[in-house]
UniProtKB/Swiss-Prot annotation:
The keyword Chloroplast applies. Keywords: Calvin cycle, Carbon dioxide fixation, Chloroplast, Photorespiration, Photosynthesis, Plastid, Transit peptide. This is Ribulose bisphosphate carboxylase small subunit, chloroplastic 7. Signal peptide: none annotated. The lineage of its organism: Eukaryota, Viridiplantae, Streptophyta, Embryophyta, Tracheophyta. Pfam families: RbcS, RuBisCO_small. GO terms for biological process: photorespiration; reductive pentose-phosphate cycle. Heterohexadecamer of 8 large and 8 small subunits. It comes from Flaveria pringlei.
């Protein structure tokens, strides 16, 4: 024999929810045909004729900001200040032979693209002033005048490299 509360609950459930019978009809939604109007999109079509492709021969690129002219000491110090404001740890690396991307140990592109640079001393944990980094840069340039030298910023919380740019190149590059 069924108890009274079970009978009441069954009746209440049947009245509360209607069974699912399928998808709703599209007739309830207004249908408007949109015209493909591209006049509001940005276009540089009129300027394409005056654009040029950057010549790849004799103008190799390295890291971030490498498309710009060589940075001055003041500009480098500002980049290091940016790195320090973001609480990244500065580090210097140098390379004596291959300043460009090349593949010696691996044939597939990746984070390091088959190249490893030598670290100058240790990462500068606790560095708070760009003058400290610039002093280390000058020492590295004095020790290895024909080296590519880059400044890297590491985020020690996320444990990733956040910025990397060339600070010095050998003569002729």
């Amino acid at each position: 024999m069924a108890s009274i509360p079970a009978t009441v609950a069954t009746v209440a459930q049947a009245n509360m929810v209607a069974p699912f019978t399928g998808l709703k009809s599209n007739a309830a939604f207004p249908v408007t045909k949109k015209v493909n109007d591209f006049s509001t999109l940005a276009s540089n079509g009129g300027r394409v004729q005056c654009m040029k492709v950057w010549p790849p021969l004799g103008k190799k690129r390295y890291e971030t900001l490498s498309y710009l002219p060589n940075l001055t000491e003041v500009q480098l110090a500002k980049e290091v200040d940016y790195l320090l404001r973001n609480k990244w740890v500065p580090c210097l690396e140098f390379e004596l032979e291959h300043g460009f991307v090349y593949r010696e140990n691996a044939r597939s592109p990746g984070y390091y693209d088959g190249r490893y640079w030598t670290m100058w001393k240790l990462p500068m944990f606790g560095c708070t002033d760009s003058a400290q980094v610039m002093k280390e840069l000058q020492e590295c340039k004095k020790e290895y005048p024909q080296a590519w030298i880059r400044i890297i910023g590491f985020d020690n919380v996320r444990q990733v490299q956040c910025i990397s740019f060339i600070a010095s190149k050998p003569d002729g590059f």
